[in-house]
């Protein structure tokens, strides 16, 4: 984890504060080509996590990075700040399919700032441009510490350093971290810079003895705000997006994305707000709640907290051929308080309840039931009037239908009833008599509909599986003719199941998926089978 902490401290120290906006470009072998619109001063971060070697080269020759690679927990990053207007195409020498085109609008000429890449072994590789390196961090007292000198790669500081009160930084070329954080007092740390020089920042300028009070790029598409203690990152999320399908309707390109939101910090994330850079691009979302402005974790089911190294997945449809950039605002809390709660509750409750209840009730009830059940076994097949020769006590014994309640019902177990349930629209028929133990309900609604080529009717459906029973649903399978479907996994031709990242629906929980089908009206899911 030390390498991860160093990586994100590096982000905080060397982010270019000239940037008006920050974008993340996923620089993986399976990434689709992207076209972004920015302005001079915007920062582009090339983010790779597929384990392959990559570099970044610009069409105008101004950028040529070293080779970098990374993984999901230790990503490789190469950051560029835009300095001139025009169309700039970025490509990789190692993968012909990787490309990104940036349309840069006019603005004042400012320095181009690049950061080093991080390889999978956690080492730091300086980027190609070489000149005076500098960085400054804002400390809790409001002072700024500036380090200047030639870049070095052994992790120590090079050059001289100076500290001032609340004044600006010193040195030939300075770069001050621009970041936001969830500090304990609720304040947001910001800073600016006024350096006219070309600067190159690498991991070698980090001073482990003087950690910054803030640590993240809040306006980037991939990182939320966080705070740092010692050299550890507390509250930090990373986001990756994968395009699954796209189509064109009425000259608008619609693209389906699956998004992985991973907690790479040290604290559990209780809640998070994702703000799109352009809300008009969001056509539909699932698994998260979208109010037209931002996305949040749902409250109708248990979706949090997101513990360290855990990932939640959601999806959306974009009215564009490229993914939407999200600004993340996570809220974390220390999970040390829940310990005393479970210790008191279980100690007293089980001691009193089982000692008295089972002693009296089971001793009498089972004694009579088995004796009476064996005698009238042949009797239920014939009516009570056939037993003329039996005594009155014998006739009264089989008459109560106590035998019918426990015996026949369990023989047609609830798992059989649920497995053969073919009724799919809400509510799915519960299993025969023990329906409260294993019960799923499917709720479907049409989100949108259209006619393609004035002939083919299409509808977009949002379906939610709700566990209304008393035991978790361990599997849910169904058949669908959907042409596009998301948030479920395919098991065969037109057959699907719960996704591996949400394979069990807890009691009271639910799972939502979506699909697009060629039809004019909504119909039931077919071949539904579920078990608990």
Curated annotation (Swiss-Prot):
InterPro entries: CBM2/CBM3_carb-bd_dom_sf, CBM_49, Cupredoxin, Dd_Spore_Germination_Stalk. This is Spore germination protein 270-11. Gene3D superfamilies: Cupredoxins - blue copper proteins. Residues 329-426 have a biased composition (Low complexity). Sequence repeats lie at residues 339-342, 343-346, 347-350, 351-354, 355-358, 359-362, 363-366, 367-370, 371-374, 375-378, 397-400, 401-404, 405-408. Residues 397-408 are annotated as: 3 X 4 AA tandem repeats of T-[EP]-T-[PD]. Residues 113-225, 328-436 are annotated as: Disordered. GO terms for biological process: extracellular matrix organization; spore germination; sporulation resulting in formation of a cellular spore. A shared internal Thr-Glu-Thr-Pro repeat defines a family of D.discoideum spore germination specific proteins. GO terms for cellular component: extracellular matrix. It comes from Dictyostelium discoideum (Social amoeba). Residues 339-378 are annotated as: 10 X 4 AA tandem repeats of T-[EP]-T-[EP]. GO terms for molecular function: carbohydrate binding; extracellular matrix structural constituent. SUPFAM superfamilies: Carbohydrate-binding domain, Cupredoxins. Keywords: Repeat, Sporulation.
């Amino acid at each position: 984890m030390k390498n991860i902490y160093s990586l994100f401290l590096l982000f905080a120290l060397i982010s270019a504060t000239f940037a008006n906006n920050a974008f993340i470009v996923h620089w993986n072998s399976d990434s689709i080509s992207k076209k972004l619109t920015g302005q001079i001063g915007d920062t582009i971060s090339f983010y790779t996590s597929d384990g392959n070697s990559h570099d970044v080269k610009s069409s105008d020759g101004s950028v040529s990075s070293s080779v970098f690679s990374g993984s999901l927990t230790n990503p490789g990053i190469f950051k560029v700040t835009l300095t001139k207007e025009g169309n700039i195409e970025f490509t990789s020498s190692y993968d012909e399919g990787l490309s990104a085109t940036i349309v840069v609008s006019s603005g004042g000429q400012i320095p181009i700032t690049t950061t080093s890449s991080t390889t999978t072994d956690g080492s730091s590789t300086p980027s190609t441009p070489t000149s005076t390196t500098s960085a400054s961090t804002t400390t809790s007292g409001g002072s700024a510490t500036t380090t200047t000198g030639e870049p070095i790669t052994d992790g120590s500081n090079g050059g001289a350093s100076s500290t001032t009160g609340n004044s600006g930084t010193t040195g030939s070329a300075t770069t001050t971290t621009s970041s936001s954080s969830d500090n304990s007092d609720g304040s947001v740390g910001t800073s600016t810079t006024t350096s006219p020089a070309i600067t190159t920042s690498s991991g070698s300028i980090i001073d482990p003895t003087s950690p910054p009070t803030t640590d993240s790029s809040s306006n980037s598409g991939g990182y939320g705000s966080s705070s740092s203690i010692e050299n550890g990152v507390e509250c930090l999320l990373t986001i990756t997006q994968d395009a699954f399908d796209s189509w064109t309707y009425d000259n608008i390109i619609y693209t389906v994305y699956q998004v992985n939101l991973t907690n790479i910090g040290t604290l559990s994330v209780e809640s998070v707000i994702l703000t799109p850079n352009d809300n008009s691009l969001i056509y539909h979302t699932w698994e998260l709640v979208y109010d037209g402005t931002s996305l949040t974790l749902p409250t109708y089911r248990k979706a949090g907290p997101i513990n360290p190294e855990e990932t939640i997945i959601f999806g959306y449809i974009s009215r564009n051929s490229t993914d939407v950039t999200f600004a993340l605002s996570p809220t974390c809390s220390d999970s040390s308080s829940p310990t005393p709660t479970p210790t008191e509750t279980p100690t007293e409750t089980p001691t009193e309840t089982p000692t008295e209840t089972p002693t009296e009730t089971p001793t009498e009830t089972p004694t009579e039931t088995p004796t009476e059940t064996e005698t009238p076994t042949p009797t239920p097949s014939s009516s009570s009037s056939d037993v003329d020769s039996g005594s009155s006590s014998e006739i009264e014994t089989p008459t109560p239908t106590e035998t019918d309640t426990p015996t026949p019902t369990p023989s047609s177990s609830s798992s059989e009833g649920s497995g053969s349930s073919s009724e799919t629209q809400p509510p799915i028929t519960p299993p025969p008599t023990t329906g409260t133990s294993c019960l799923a309900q499917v709720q479907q609604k049409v989100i949108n509909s259209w006619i393609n080529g004035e002939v083919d009717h299409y509808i977009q459906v949002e379906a939610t599986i709700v566990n209304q029973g008393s035991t978790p649903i361990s599997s849910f399978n169904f058949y669908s003719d959907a042409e596009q479907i998301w948030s479920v996994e395919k098991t065969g031709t037109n057959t699907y199941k719960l996704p591996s990242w949400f394979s069990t629906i807890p009691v009271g929980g639910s799972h939502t998926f979506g699909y697009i089908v060629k039809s004019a009206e909504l119909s039931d899911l077919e071949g539904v089978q579920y078990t608990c």
